Amino acid sequence: SCMSLSLDEAVDMAMKNNPDVLITQLGEEKAKAGLRQARGQNSISWTAGSTFGRSDNNNLGWNNSNNNKISASLPIYSGGVHQNNIKSSELDVDIAKLQTERKWETTQLAVIQAYYDVLEAQKKIGVYQDTVNKYQQHLINVEQLYSAGSKAKVEVLRSEVELSNARQDLIKGKNTYYNNLSTLRNLLYLDSQEPLELTDDFVYIPFAGSIGDCVDFALANRKELLIDSYQLQQKELAVKNAKAGYLPTVDLSLGAGWNKQVLPDGDNHEYSASIGVSWNIFDSGVTAGKVDAANTELKIAQATLQKDKNDIDLSVRKNYNSMREAEERFNSTETAIKQAEEDYFIAQEKYKAGEGIMLDIIDAQEALSTARQNYISAQYDYARYKAALEADMGGTNEPAPIDN
């Protein structure tokens, strides 16, 4: 049986089957676990311990001993370290969510491009096959004219060469199709032998946004830039944590203990409460080194954000310009196909009537094949560049409505 697959179905299948998507989703769970840890470090913690012993002192008999203790501790002041760690962990959760969303976008783009690659290769096989058929028919006509004595042997040989070359293009085109199909199957994690029937095809959807609109939209919505800004905030928190090394820490501790019985009573108990203050007065420059390192990391994060903005700006502009170029190409090549078809028909009829030459047929056929291939390439180039532009912008919606 043959699996029918629309473009939306292909994207959904990739989202379900691609382990890269699962990995980013698991990253969200890891970030949430880290947040729970950070919050726990700023809360009360309980510990309990119990020891049981048995000893014989100078053969006076065995004595049993039992010591029990319960204690609780609570950080009162950490110079803001615990609070900063909680904020940083909350940012980790947001970053993990954005990474998952970006993985969805890049996976969707890869599937869309692979889907259109298959369709393009399939369409071009039709062009190559039509060229082979035309050269095959032309060879038959030349052989008949040669048998009648109206054409030279050299024209038969030239026709055979052109037919052979056309078959080479057909073979290469089929190989491109099979390779593109394998790439699509790989993205969808399908069996490499399962036949596929792609049910969607290119549909021209105008894109009305200007290049400036697209760049602005990308700089506001691109997930990587949002991630960079969150990581920049984390580096700022890390600087505060490093400077907290100059400050004291205060902890509250409570405890209870007893021995020789399971539970304490009025005659057998020990209660304690304490507030501990710790202040690292001199550490031979360790804290200063941590502050310098944190400030350097902050500068790196700032530079990374600026670099990514520049890279995204360039990528958006390239894909936008390439999309517009492809749009102009397929609008112009549609007329070229009709002209090439008419030119080929005229050249063929003139040749049959003995008024044309072999070169006219070859040139007309090559022009027709090229025009058809250019039209196909332009269509799917437009679709691929439009998808790439939308992915570059960080979403599937263009910044301006389509003018009807």
What are these regions (language model features)?
Residues 1-47, 76, 192-233, 281, ...:
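Bacterial Sec-pathway N-terminal export signals of envelope proteins
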Residues 5, 103-217, 319-322, 326, ...:
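Periplasmic alpha-helical coiled-coil/stalk elements that build and connect Gram-negative outer-membrane
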Residues 22, 45-65, 73-102, 226, ...:
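Small/polar (Gly/Ser/Thr/Ala-rich) solvent-exposed segments
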